[in-house]
Design a protein with these regions (language model features):
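A general structural signal marking secondary-structure boundaries and capping sites
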Residues: 25, 83-86, 96, 115-116, ...
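ATP-binding pocket architecture of kinase catalytic cores
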Residues: 32-149, 182
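An alpha-helical support segment within catalytic cores of ATP-dependent transferases
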Residues: 6-26, 136-190, 194-209, 257, ...
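Charged catalytic carboxylate motif
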Residues: 13, 74, 129, 133, ...
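Active-site activation/catalytic loop segments of kinase-like enzymes and analogous catalytic loops
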Residues: 227-258, 271-290
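Short secondary-structure junctions
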Residues: 25-33
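Active-site acidic catalytic loop and adjacent metal/ATP-binding pocket
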Residues: 35-47, 53-54, 58-59, 92, ...
Length: 317
């Protein structure tokens, strides 16, 4: 096996486990680290057959992740649920949630074509595609509901960025001191954002982009669609500027999505998710820099978060 670099090497037990789930005559010939995720280490495994052809699988390894067994069980269950729904998700090959066979809890799945696209170019084309894909996810009606959503950020855990608009942030924190508004539950991805969506897009034709896959289903939940909308909006705001966060919410409605009926209810979910980023700016910005957005330093992302929260609090309605 040839590794692209030392980091790409699959741990011995995980390699043996993955190999046991190949077709007769196949073997793993190459591995490659896939960047962009936060929850798990992700590697592409190139699988060679006797006849000379190859196919790819993806190995997700949950190293040092609290509640890894739970995360992995949820993702495996979601992948089985999504089969046949029309949502472009990976197919489940095997799961080892308790690390009975691997060094760490691991998940083996099919590889989807495409790549994540985090560049500014072509964003006006991709935002409506993201919105339509999220509407399709929310249209899923599972026979068995996933667990209810969990929102861990509280008014007391918010970290106000240095130099932030104190008035806007105080008002935003006061918003999430209130009880959550009532909602009609739907199936949620719960981590839907550009880093978890794969596109087929030619560099010379960014306007011809199409979505080929949605990945990282470990946080699937049941809850208000506004949570998913808010999460993607916040990611877009930090990646591309606050205006794009607000634009995504509009695009979701234009695509047929049904957010909360009142502006105050929508604001609650948007603010809650935006403030959650205040606790993990370093964590979320590192994969973006690894993916080529080197200008997105922690400070730049903090400034964009401040501008986004301020824009939410200044928005009419």
């Amino acid at each position: 096996m040839t590794d692209h670099d030392e980091a790409a090497a699959v741990r011995p037990l995980a390699l043996a486990w993955a190999s046991r789930h190949l077709e007769a005559g196949e073997r793993i010939v190459r591995t490659e680290v896939l960047h962009g995720g936060v929850t798990a280490e992700t590697r592409r495994l190139a699988v060679g057959a006797r006849g000379g052809g190859t196919r790819d699988l993806v190995l997700r390894t949950f190293v040092g992740v609290e509640h890894a067994e739970d995360w992995l069980d949820r993702e495996a269950g979601a992948l089985m649920l999504l089969k046949g729904t029309g949502v472009p998700a990976p197919g489940l090959v095997a799961a080892d949630p308790t690390a009975a066979y691997c060094e760490y809890p691991s998940l083996l799945m099919t590889h989807l074509a495409g790549r994540t696209v985090l560049d500014d170019e072509g964003l006006e084309t991709r935002v409506p595609l993201l919105a339509r894909q999220l509407v399709a996810i929310h249209a899923i009606r599972p026979a068995e509901r996933p667990r209810e959503y969990v929102a861990l950020t509280t008014a007391d855990t918010v970290v106000t960025p240095k130099g932030a608009d104190a008035v806007a942030w105080t008002a935003a924190i006061d918003v999430i001191r209130q009880p959550a508004p009532p909602y009609e539950g739907r199936f949620l991805h719960r981590d839907f954002h550009p880093g978890n969506v794969l596109f087929d897009v030619a560099p010379a034709r960014p306007a011809g982009a199409r979505i080929t896959g949605v990945v990282d289903w470990a946080a699937t939940s049941w809850g208000p669609v506004d949570l998913d909308v808010a999460h993607c909006s916040a990611n877009l705001a930090l990646l591309h500027g606050p205006a794009w966060g607000l634009r995504f919410a509009e695009a979701y409605e234009e695509a047929g999505g049904m957010p909360a009926s009142t502006a105050s209810e929508r604001l609650y979910w948007w603010v809650r998710d935006g403030l959650a980023f205040s606790e993990e700016v370093r964590l979320v910005s590192q994969p973006w820099r690894e993916a080529g957005r080197t200008e997105l330093t922690t400070r730049v992302v903090e400034e964009r978060l401040d501008a986004y929260v301020t824009a939410l609090m200044d928005a009419p309605g």
